[in-house]
A protein has these predicted regions:
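Transmembrane-lumen/periplasm boundary regions of multi-pass, lipid-linked membrane glycan transferases
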Residues: 44-54, 200-340, 348-351, 368-416
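Short periplasmic/luminal acceptor-recognition loop of GT-C membrane glycosyltransferases, typified by
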Residues: 421-434, 442-567
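Extracytosolic helix-loop segments that constitute the early lumenal/periplasmic catalytic or substrate-binding loops
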Residues: 26, 44-68, 75, 82-85
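Start-transfer (signal-anchor) and selected internal transmembrane alpha helices
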Residues: 1-28, 143, 239-243
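Specific aromatic-rich, kink-prone transmembrane helix
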Residues: 158, 172-188, 349-352
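Transmembrane-helix motifs of polytopic, lipid-linked glycan transferases
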Residues: 99-137, 155, 178
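Membrane-interface transmembrane helices that cradle and orient dolichyl/undecaprenyl
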Residues: 144, 179-197, 202-205, 309-310, ...
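Short acidic/glycine- and proline-prone juxtamembrane loop motifs at membrane-interface regions
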Residues: 158-171, 210-211
């Protein structure tokens, strides 16, 4: 027997404008008024910027001003570079590149919604018919489940930061969602169009990140077709597989043909192969500890959905669970896993979790609600208190800690940002009043506070705290200081142990002309170390007669030191 029994009143869908507004509130903050931030955001922007201002070789082989990035595939950077070409003159290159995150997010959000809708309107997913009628229509039920899936997807903590970075993870997770949408359409009604969409999604995934995740998803889809949905196997093998193979092969062929002698293709394939290893206890421990918070609140509701639907042979469980299992197994054999590699799990978890919403007990719904209310309201309150301390100096201890983390930071007051923060906070209070006061019966009531609270906290950070975050996470200050000490007639800059994010930031913000492979030794040398402990070892690597022109570091970072030398002519 199906585990769902509910009236039509529970399937009230969110208005389209409301969903669109929520998505815009989620993704737009952070696009404007900030520089590329350290680590992946700056490195990803550096590749886009290099492509936009470089040659055909830069477009085919991802690099940061000559620094090869063999573990990166080019698709996300092509999109960012194209946007820089189109809008960089108007918005600045950094903002234009960041529009790519908006495009990627839109693809992922739409794919999650559509997948849940396709699966939710199937007969096997429909609730039991009531004795005297009044059950929801199939389309209405599917739309409500789709709204719930999107809310759960947006509420996942792991998605928040990565979806705002100009790097491959933002596109990667969206293409995973697109692959599940195409797979749902194919298994629902086998046809060539859906198979082509699945093949294109898998092929583009390879161009976005590498072949490990696409391979895992392909195995899951093929296994599902062989075991349960054999009527889709022919389209899968004859259409999806050839398209999935052709797309990355075109890029590899272009590398071989247009860049003869280049080792980019071999280096990329080798870098992907190095991602895999035998299962280790550390990997299992990392997965268990990270996934608990990374996929909250999707994972507990998804686990409940599997239990609630355990007696039913349904596509919405088979498709998502097979994908989740394949991706978890891949994570277990991943060498030195990182948190962003778990992003691929979020779309299938969110889609599966929405089918658990109609079966949740009142106690579970209340527990999720109160956890969201207490936790996210406390975080929002602390953000406000920290901002007050930053602006006024009270409470003094908190203000001291704020400035200790960002020495030299000068607070600024922005009326427009304050108005947005106040309006968002009032909106949160109204949402609490609606959810806790009226006690609505709609399916997505269990996750609306989780999503709304997360959006609130992100908006507060991107309005009240953006200047501080920009100061603490950007290389703008040290790049500007270094630029003032560059000789007017210098030719180029060699580097020693300079990180990829730093290279990208100094090239863009500091306008440094870095050397490229094959260039003669430059007249300047930029060295990065972590202080006195390694300075002696660094000096042994440096050859020639050098004059120190400048040394410094980011005020907010005690472990990154930079020294700029000029090579003396012999």
């Amino acid at each position: 027997m199906k585990p769902v029994r509910l009236p039509a009143a529970a399937t009230l869908a969110l208005p389209r404008w409301g969903l669109v507004a929520l998505c815009l509130l989620y993704i737009l903050p952070g696009i404007l008024r900030r520089d590329p931030w350290k680590t992946d955001d700056a490195a990803g922007f550096g590749i886009m910027w290099t492509m936009a201002h470089g040659s055909l070789a830069d477009w085919l082989s991802p690099n940061i001003v000559g620094l090869a990035m063999p573990n990166e595939a080019p698709l996300a950077f092509w999109v960012g570079a194209l946007l820089i070409k189109l809008f960089g003159w108007l918005l600045t290159d950094a903002v234009a590149a960041r529009i790519s995150t908006l495009v990627f997010f839109a693809i992922g959000a739409a794919a999650v919604w559509r997948t849940a809708f396709v699966l939710g309107r199937r007969n096997e997913a429909q609730p039991l018919k009531l004795a005297f009628g009044g059950q929801p229509a199939a389309i209405d039920y599917g739309r409500t489940l789709a709204d719930g899936a999107l809310l759960i997807y947006l509420a996942c903590l792991g998605l928040l930061l990565r979806s705002h970075e100009t790097a491959t993870p933002a596109l990667h997770v969206s293409l995973v969602a697109a692959a599940f949408y195409a797979g749902a359409c194919l298994f629902d009604k086998p046809n060539v169009r859906s198979a082509a969409g699945l093949g294109a999604s898998i092929g583009l995934l390879v161009l976005a990140r590498g072949w490990t995740v696409p391979l895992a998803l392909s195995i899951a889809m093929l296994a599902l077709a062989i075991i349960r949905y054999r009527d889709s196997l022919r389209q899968l093998l004859s259409v999806a597989v050839p398209i999935a193979l052709t797309i990355p092969l075109l890029w590899l062929l272009a590398l071989r043909t247009l860049l003869p002698g280049s080792e980019v293709a071999d280096a990329w394939l080798a870098a992907n192969l190095k991602l895999l290893s035998t299962p280790k206890l550390f990997t299992l421990s990392f997965l268990a500890k990270t996934l608990v918070w990374y996929s909250w609140p999707a994972w507990p509701i998804a686990a409940w959905a599997v239990w609630a639907w355990r007696a039913q042979a349904t596509l919405h469980v088979a498709l998502t669970v097979s994908g989740i299992l394949a991706l978890i197994l891949l994570s277990l054999v991943t060498n030195s896993p990182k948190d962003h590699e778990l992003l691929a799990l979020l779309p299938p978890m969110a889609i599966l979790a929405t089918f658990g919403l109609p079966t949740l007990k009142r106690g579970a719904i209340n527990a999720i609600d109160w956890f969201s209310v207490m936790t996210l309201s406390a975080i929002a309150g602390f953000i406000w208190l920290g901002w007050i301390a930053k602006q006024t100096g009270w409470p003094p201890k908190l203000a001291g800690n704020v400035f200790k983390l960002a020495p030299g930071f000068q607070p600024e007051f922005n009326v427009f940002a304050l108005i947005i923060a106040l309006a968002t906070s009032v909106g949160w209070l109204l949402l609490l009043r609606w959810r806790l006061g009226r006690r609505p019966s709609v399916l997505w009531r269990a996750v609306v506070l989780s999503t709304g609270g997360l959006v609130l906290c992100w908006l507060l950070l991107m309005t009240l705290w953006l200047p501080w975050l920009n100061y603490a996470q950007s290389y703008a200050s040290v790049a500007g200081e270094m630029r003032q000490h560059l000789p007017a007639d210098y030719r180029c800059v060699d580097t020693n142990d300079l990180g990829s994010a730093q290279r990208a930031s100094f090239a863009y913000l500091g306008e440094l002309r870095f050397s490229r492979p094959g260039d003669a030794p430059c007249d300047l040398l930029l060295v990065q170390d972590d202080g006195l402990r390694k300075r002696g070892a660094q000096m042994k690597k440096i050859e020639g007669d050098l004059t120190l022109l400048w040394q410094g570091r980011r005020p907010a970072d005690r472990h990154e030191f930079y020294r700029l030398y000029q090579r003396n002519a012999r």
